[in-house]
Regions:
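Extracellular/lumenal and peripheral-membrane lipid-interaction modules
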Residues: 2-246
Length: 246
């Protein structure tokens, strides 16, 4: 091969490599429209939605731990409330510091058949929007078991392997040891997590009866069998989020 041919081949290779690299960079840097639309603009409306979400969380906690024995409870959260709360109280109370390193600006989009979770990973030019599509349902044959089916995992517009996410989820559950167990299986090639609440309790004190998705909202319904025992078993997961109930 002549020197001229070699230089031409190298030049073509470099152009192709740069083109592939630029394409991958553009795919990773792509910001999904749903993620952008999920952001609630700052202002009085967002503040009110954040307060509504915080109040609903506090009422949910109170319902679960203070209702009379066997009394039913139910609560509804909209994705606008959740995203407003994540942008306001979640930040002001410094709860965002508990997010894994590199993750910021989480947002949710709730649809009738799935929940879309997205967040920014990294910062500046080296950041990307990671989006996760989840189908969610209560397992009928077992009490207090929620199934999460991971049907989509992207960095920008680029599909990526879910293995690292699965390992991270397993580690988090093992670290906390809060009576929540998780098992995995595959359905139609997609990983499915079976999340068991009060997994170590032979007689659960909290019974989930309904988790229903609709356009822009999620309903949660259940009842508590023994509120006093449940209060002793759980640490308040909302901590500084709680509002005074008096």
């Amino acid at each position: 091969m002549s020197r001229r041919s070699l230089l031409l081949a190298v030049a073509i290779f470099l152009c192709l490599a740069c083109g592939v690299g630029a394409t991958l960079w553009m795919l990773v840097r792509y910001e999904p429209r749903l993620y952008l639309l999920a952001a609630v603009p700052p202002g009085n409306d967002r503040h009110k939605l954040s307060e509504d979400c915080q109040r609903e969380l506090s009422q949910l906690w109170y319902s679960v731990t203070n209702q009379e024995d066997e009394q039913k409870w139910g609560h509804r959260f909209t994705d606008k409330q959740i995203n407003s709360w994540l942008a306001e109280h979640f930040v002001s109370s410094r709860l965002e510091e508990f997010l894994p390193e590199g993750i910021s600006q989480p947002r949710f989009v709730i649809e009738p058949d799935k929940i879309r979770v997205a967040f920014r990973y990294g910062s500046g030019l080296w950041s990307t929007i990671v989006s996760i599509d989840l189908r969610l349902w209560l397992v009928k044959c077992e009490p207090n078991v929620v199934a999460l089916k991971l049907v989509g995992f992207h960095a920008g517009a680029l599909p990526i392997s879910a293995q690292s996410l699965l390992e991270s989820i397993n580690e988090k559950f093992q670290e906390h040891g809060s009576g929540i167990g998780v098992d995995w299986y595959r359905d139609e090639g997609y990983p499915v997590a079976l999340i068991r609440f009060q997994a170590e309790q032979p007689h659960p004190t909290l019974v989930l009866e309904l988790i229903k998705l609709e356009k822009g909202a999620i309903h949660i319904q259940g009842h508590t069998k023994d509120p006093a025992s449940l209060r002793a078993f759980l640490a308040d997961p909302f901590g500084s989020l709680r509002l005074a109930t008096e």
